[in-house]
Amino acid sequence: MKRIGVLTSGGDSPGMNAAIRAVVRKAIYHDIEVYGIYHGYAGLISGHIEKLELGSVGDIIHRGGTKLYTARCPEFKDPAVREKGIEQLKKHGIEGLVVIGGDGSYQGAKKLTEQGFPCVGVPGTIDNDIPGTDFTIGFDTALNTVIDAIDKIRDTATSHERTYVIEVMGRHAGDIALWAGLADGAETILIPEAEYDMDDVIARLKRGSERGKKHSIIVVAEGVGSAIDIGKKIEEATNFDTRVTVLGHVQRGGSPSAQDRVLASRLGARAVELLMEGKGGRCVGIQNNKLVDHDIIEALAQKHVIDIDMYQLSKELSI
């Protein structure tokens, strides 16, 4: 393989630039040319493709976002549209493609693979919801952003003796809420993977108040439902002074953590190795701190599973 492409797709995550850098430098080290595809699958279809050199990826390892930009491209679900993308790849002499992104990006890579073009998926999403890897690129940075925000909110919650409901990202996965809530000692953590009883949440808050607790933190993954509605129910049932904070897109930005930079570098380089070995249709990951790769079709057939033991621990420690 003499020429490969790389793109980022879907929601951005801190560390994507480190992954791009690793792909480019690993490939060039092995005398393989690299072409960057801008704006994800949309750029692939339109032919927004440029050759990347060593200097193209200088001074980006510490930067959030993605140098290649990103976009969502629902029309890529159409086989005829994907064929246009494959034609663009062949036009530029590209023989393999590294796709950095989340579940939707993997779906695109899977479809390209099924249409005969070799792709390798690299997990880049703050949600940490990609099967086949313990951690995704961007999760650690987003987690630390959330923890920093909750630390600050707890300061004001303590000062004003308030209850705060804090909504974090995670439409289908509660990893950010669970890890941040546990790390910050949240009184309650609500995630999409676990049912909850609002009466139980209220009862726990009241028990805390009865033993002298003056403030509380509830961390809610967005997939659970409206944090505003939850806050209203709490205030109506308890008369506690309650505030709601939705952290939003601040979770996606910022300089990637050391862990995300290293993870992205390892995964990006491994993706290139797989293409060099002629192994398309794979996705890379890390499990027990060891690099792994899986069939991308089989990986997508699996479901991300929350750490139930950790969730139970959070409940036991927040009595």
From Swiss-Prot:
Q: Mind telling me which SUPFAM superfamilies this protein's record contains?
A: Phosphofructokinase (SSF53784)
One cellular component term from this protein's GO annotations in UniProt: 6-phosphofructokinase complex
Q: Which residues bind ADP?
A: R21, A22, V23, V24, R25, R154, G185, A186, E187, R211, K213, K214, H215
InterPro entries assigned to the protein according to its UniProt record, in alphabetical order:
ATP_PFK, ATP_PFK_prok-type, PFKA_ATP_prok, Phosphofructokinase_CS, Phosphofructokinase_dom, PKF_sf
What the entry lists under PROSITE patterns is as follows:
PHOSPHOFRUCTOKINASE
A Gene Ontology biological process in which this protein takes part is:
fructose 6-phosphate metabolic process
Q: Does the UniProt entry include the keyword Iron?
A: no
Instruction: Locate the residues binding substrate.
Output: T125, I126, D127, R162, M169, G170, R171, E222, R243, H249, V250, Q251, R252
* Alphabetically ordered keywords of this record: Allosteric enzyme, ATP-binding, Cytoplasm, Glycolysis, Kinase, Magnesium, Metal-binding, Nucleotide-binding, Transferase
Cellular compartments annotated = Cytoplasm
Coarse class of the protein's main subcellular location: cytoplasm
Regulation of activity is described as: Allosterically activated by ADP and other diphosphonucleosides, and allosterically inhibited by phosphoenolpyruvate.
Its recorded reaction(s) are: beta-D-fructose 6-phosphate + ATP = beta-D-fructose 1,6-bisphosphate + ADP + H(+)
Its cofactor is: Mg(2+)
Q: In which pathway does it act?
A: Carbohydrate degradation; glycolysis; D-glyceraldehyde 3-phosphate and glycerone phosphate from D-glucose: step 3/4
Binding locations of Mg(2+): D103
Highest taxon listed in the record's lineage = Bacteria
- Which residue positions are annotated as catalytic? D127 (proton acceptor)
Q: Return the EC number.
A: 2.7.1.11
What function is annotated for this protein? Answer: Catalyzes the phosphorylation of D-fructose 6-phosphate to fructose 1,6-bisphosphate by ATP, the first committing step of glycolysis.
Q: Could you tell me which PANTHER family the record lists for this protein?
A: ATP-DEPENDENT 6-PHOSPHOFRUCTOKINASE (PTHR13697:SF4), PHOSPHOFRUCTOKINASE (PTHR13697)
Q: Which family does it belong to?
A: Belongs to the phosphofructokinase type A (PFKA) family. ATP-dependent PFK group I subfamily. Prokaryotic clade 'B1' sub-subfamily.
Q: How does it associate, per the subunit comment?
A: Homotetramer.
> What is the name of this protein?
ATP-dependent 6-phosphofructokinase
Native organism: Bacillus cytotoxicus (strain DSM 22905 / CIP 110041 / 391-98 / NVH 391-98)
Taxonomic lineage from the root: Bacteria, Bacillati, Bacillota, Bacilli, Bacillales
